[in-house]
Amino acid sequence: MIFLKILLLPFSLLYGGITAIRNYAYDKGWYKSYTLPVAVVCVGNIKAGGTGKTPFTQLLLQQFAGKYKTAVLSRGYGRKTKGFVLATAASTSAEIGDEPLQLYTHAQGVYAVAVCEDRVAGVEKLLQLIPDLKLVILDDGFQHRRINRDVNILLTEYQAPFYADWVLPAGRLREFRNGATRADAVVVTKTPAHAALLKTDNILRHTAKAIPVLYTTIEYGATRNEDGNYTWQPNEKAVLVTGIANPQPLVQYLNSRHIDIIKQFEFKDHYSYTLRDIQQMLDYQNANDGVKIVMTEKDWVKVVPLLRELNLSKGWYYVPIQIGIYSDQQQLLNTVETKIIDRLNRLTQHT
């Protein structure tokens, strides 16, 4: 593996060099960044692949959407549409992407969710539709520098921190590690239970200043479907369906609950399910005494319209997740809110 990385290193240097030149051009003002009349909080990473952005974004929404008129803007990775799309109750993952759809299912009218490849155009459209909009959360926008933001929150996985990785293709980084200097706070995700919080010094060596570092974990909720919660029996058999970057933590959780996974349908991240996929799972279910089929909530929002189309509901479930906090979250939340308030005050002074 190390030998392969060494072979790929010249390509990584080329890729990283191109992104470094681009960042330098933004730093010097040669590429224009737009300041829009709204507070902007960016949640992102410098590593390709899942780092747990969605549950952390939900945490921010829980904290701030009730205080400030808020919208989430995402690129909508994996969607089949183009341009600006505002999420509605009729939206599908094909229209807005699976993660924005998952965020919208929790919105309950408190915040708006939209997708647009051009983040500047997306925010401008949101301001047209919601004139009293105060806060925009940019989902996965760390490299999208055309919009000036008030807070840059960098996420990194505990088991695979950015400072121990290489730039693509030798590693998974989208840019050199010094991209972390743009962060105003770092969130360490997927921290194992009872893990020592020893990575802070390594993280702060790569940031521009002493900034808040928050350690979080993934907490799994009760298995459920549209009819309510389901209680597993000891050693009950199940079929697991996953279309996420790393299903292993979910597998470990189900095993810890003494659930016997007899089959796993494993798809790539952001996979778009088809009726043929559902039929294949259904055939396996019917051939195995109606064994329960369980999946992530991210997969569920894509699968449930197909289940309705086939008039299926019983025996299909998902495991919801939320973020758990291992370290003091107040310093980070105070940092974010202070910058939001400062931005809104400046906007008020100029109106």
Swiss-Prot record:
Transmembrane segments: none annotated. ATP binds at residues 47-54. Pathway: Glycolipid biosynthesis; lipid IV(A) biosynthesis; lipid IV(A) from (3R)-3-hydroxytetradecanoyl-[acyl-carrier-protein] and UDP-N-acetyl-alpha-D-glucosamine: step 6/6. It comes from the Bacteria. GO terms for molecular function: ATP binding; tetraacyldisaccharide 4'-kinase activity. It holds the Pfam family LpxK. One of its GO terms (biological process) is lipid A biosynthetic process. Keywords: ATP-binding, Kinase, Lipid A biosynthesis, Lipid biosynthesis, Lipid metabolism, Nucleotide-binding, Transferase. InterPro entries: LpxK, P-loop_NTPase. Disulfide bonds: none annotated. It catalyses: a lipid A disaccharide + ATP = a lipid IVA + ADP + H(+). GO terms for cellular component: plasma membrane. Its EC number is 2.7.1.130. Transfers the gamma-phosphate of ATP to the 4'-position of a tetraacyldisaccharide 1-phosphate intermediate (termed DS-1-P) to form tetraacyldisaccharide 1,4'-bis-phosphate (lipid IVA). Belongs to the LpxK family. This is Tetraacyldisaccharide 4'-kinase. It comes from Cytophaga hutchinsonii (strain ATCC 33406 / DSM 1761 / CIP 103989 / NBRC 15051 / NCIMB 9469 / D465).
